């Protein structure tokens, strides 16, 4: 039997696999790339463990895990299957079949639209929203609004990485947790 690995050691390992690309996508930006962690099987398992353990402790009442288009999808299914919960996607406009609700939100370079299938979340269901990154908070604010439109209740927003200097957390109501802060 191998020794148990602490959450801190798991997190350090995941951090070591996150790529850094200066001046991408434009001059002056340091892009942190989660895909480096996802291509490493051990880092991927550790990341799943950290997210699942956090929800077990912080939001045990959760019934649905929602992932945001597109990197949030990489995590919500992993979490939901491990916890035996439902999962639902929030997608960009025009990507979901059936009846949808939508909300527009501001990006630093314009406006975009998120959509959610009306049947994905039942009124009163408790939801954890998962994404890879919290920057300005615009996408998580929009997701929370969208979930509210179908009667869901966001109990927590959970992200892998947070860019603290952009202060996106200040725009969000309710619990917010990030595994890694830059």
From Swiss-Prot:
Any GO CC annotation of this UniProt entry: cytoplasm
MF GO annotations: adenine binding; adenine phosphoribosyltransferase activity; AMP binding
Pathway per the UniProt entry: Purine metabolism; AMP biosynthesis via salvage pathway; AMP from adenine: step 1/1
Record flagged with keyword Transport: no
Keywords: Cytoplasm, Glycosyltransferase, Purine salvage, Transferase
PROSITE patterns, alphabetized: PUR_PYR_PR_TRANSFER
EC class of the enzyme, as a word: transferase
Enzymatic reactions: AMP + diphosphate = 5-phospho-alpha-D-ribose 1-diphosphate + adenine
Localization terms from the record: Cytoplasm
InterPro entries found in the cross-reference section: Ade_phspho_trans, PRibTrfase_dom, PRTase-like, UPRTase/APRTase
Domain of life: Eukaryota
Enzyme Commission no: 2.4.2.7
BP-aspect Gene Ontology terms: adenine salvage; AMP salvage; purine ribonucleoside salvage
SS bond list: none
Subunit structure and binding partners: Homodimer.
Recorded family membership: Belongs to the purine/pyrimidine phosphoribosyltransferase family.
NCBIfam families documented for this protein: PRK02304.1-5
Protein role: Catalyzes a salvage reaction resulting in the formation of AMP, that is energically less costly than de novo synthesis.
UniProt name for this protein: Adenine phosphoribosyltransferase
Gene from which the chain derives: Aprt
């Amino acid at each position: 039997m191998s020794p148990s690995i602490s959450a801190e050691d798991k997190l350090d390992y995941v951090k070591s696999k996150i790529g850094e690309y200066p001046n991408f996508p434009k001059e002056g930006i340091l892009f942190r790339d989660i895909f480096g962690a996802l291509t490493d099987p051990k880092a991927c398992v550790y990341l799943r463990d950290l997210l699942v353990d956090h929800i077990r402790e912080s939001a045990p009442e959760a019934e649905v895990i929602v992932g945001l288009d597109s990197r949030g999808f990489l995590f919500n299914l992993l979490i939901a299957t491990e916890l035996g919960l439902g999962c639902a996607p929030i997608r960009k406009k025009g990507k979901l079949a059936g009846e949808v609700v939508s909300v527009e939100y501001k990006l630093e370079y314009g406006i975009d639209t998120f959509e959610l299938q009306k049947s994905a979340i039942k009124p009163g269901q408790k939801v954890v929203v998962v994404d890879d990154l919290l920057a300005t908070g615009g996408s998580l604010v929009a997701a929370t609004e969208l979930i509210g439109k179908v009667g869901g209740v966001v109990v927590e927003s959970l992200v892998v990485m947070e860019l603290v200097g952009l202060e996106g957390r200040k725009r969000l109501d309710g619990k917010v947790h990030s595994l890694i802060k830059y």
